[in-house]
Amino acid sequence: MSDYILGIESSCDDTSAAVIKDGFLLSNVIASQQVHKDYGGVVPELASRAHEQNIVPVVSQALDKAGIKASDLTAIAFTRGPGLLGSLLVGTSFAKALGVALNIPIIMVNHLQGHILADFVKQEGKENHHPSFPYLCLLVSGGNSQIVKVNGPLDYEILGQTIDDAVGEAFDKCSKMMGLGYPGGPVIDRLAKLGDPDRFKFAKPQIPGLDYSFSGVKTSLLYFVRDEMAKDPDFMEKNKEDICAGFQKTLIDILMDKLIKAARQTGVKEVTIGGGVSANSGLRSRIEEEGRKRGWNTYLPEFKFTTDNAAMIAIAGWFHYLAGERTPLDIAPVSRIAYY
């Protein structure tokens, strides 16, 4: 008998629902919120209200595209955290209510675990490649920057993480600082392709071990732009491509230096990336380049699985389901959560 898992993702500003059948993706529906662009970042209250409006039609579309009825579902996987509490509450409450109505189990999932396991989402008609255990995952997003050693589907070891800002936050804040808009990652990536990455240099932090820090890079860019704009008010407009190229190269260098060190220390040759920043073209090219140079087997998630989506929540939930794990109905969402 086949297992149909409904995944629900609502940790930030994307409402998503997906259905998998025995690990194969049948549908993945995402409703993104455009209202936050006007504010230069996600407004939690607006995000949770939009989730309330989107959750029912998004789940309905996911079931329709999968060609099944709600009564065919085996279990419901949902994001418990980390994320915005108001947004998480919408997805958690819906999952609990639907689980009770259908008399099927619910399964809580760590949002970051979903990103880590995104490569395991199988699709009909495609070659489905995923890393072998153990593997290293460079997890990079707006809220997190970590190097995780993945020993098994439910066995994680954090080797290093940011001690201040996440790399995605650095992209967003510096894009706003330069007047390039939100979200910053795609804009900076696009402009960086047109610029000289070696023309402008920015400070790199000297953090021991495998931890990251990105606050100093932001400060370095801030002072640089401020000083140059004082000399020439048009400096930013004249040089934005080169500034973006240099800034992006600095961030990628920081990320890769620690990942290379982690691979050397652990001896692990299976390497993947996950999270929203894993869509960055410069980072994807660099990790493939380093992989060829160092004999790594590298895995890059499809672009549709880099941003927040329910397919990754469904596959993570499926692994929990196979392990016999179930979540009680008195569970509540949390903004911060450990791997489990």
Feature annotation, model-predicted:
Residues 1-2, 109-135, 316:
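Conserved phosphate-binding catalytic cores of ATP/NTP-utilizing and phosphoryl-transfer enzymes
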Residues 3-82, 111, 243:
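N-terminal beta-alpha supersecondary unit
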Residues 108-109, 288-313:
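Conserved phosphate-binding/catalytic loops in two-lobed NTP-binding clefts
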Residues 115-117, 301-340:
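Glycine-rich phosphate-binding/hydrolytic loop that grips phosphoryl groups
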Residues 69, 190-271, 280-294, 321-324:
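A contiguous, well-structured pocket-lining segment that forms one wall/lid of small-molecule binding clefts
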Residues 15-20, 137-139, 145-149:
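Short beta-strand scaffold segments in enzyme catalytic cores
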Residues 151-194, 218-219, 223-227:
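Glycine-rich phosphate-binding loop plus the immediately following alpha-helix
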